[in-house]
Amino acid sequence: MEKISAFFVILFLVSSCLVTMSVGDICQTDRDCVEIGIPRCKRTGKMPICYNGYCCCICSAKRLPASTTRKPPSPSTSKLV
């Protein structure tokens, strides 16, 4: 009986790890979505984008533009003593 219980505990732990790995981030760039074989979006016909680690078709409106301007240093941090 103890061996069966231990087997099920190990099986549960292994399956939990597999679920965690499959639910994690699947992309870091838009190109990753193409390489893993995500099909074109049905509504737009465009390729999905990578948004927060997931390939997404409806996220393009929510994507924040990359800022190219740098924030000037504040006076308190730019002083040399």
Swiss-Prot record:
One of its GO terms (biological process) is defense response to fungus. Keywords: Antimicrobial, Disulfide bond, Fungicide, Plant defense, Secreted, Signal. Residues 1-24 form the signal peptide. Its main location: secreted. Disulfide bonds join 27-50, 33-57, 41-59. It is found in: Secreted. GO terms for cellular component: extracellular region. Belongs to the DEFL family. This is Defensin-like protein 311. It comes from Arabidopsis thaliana.
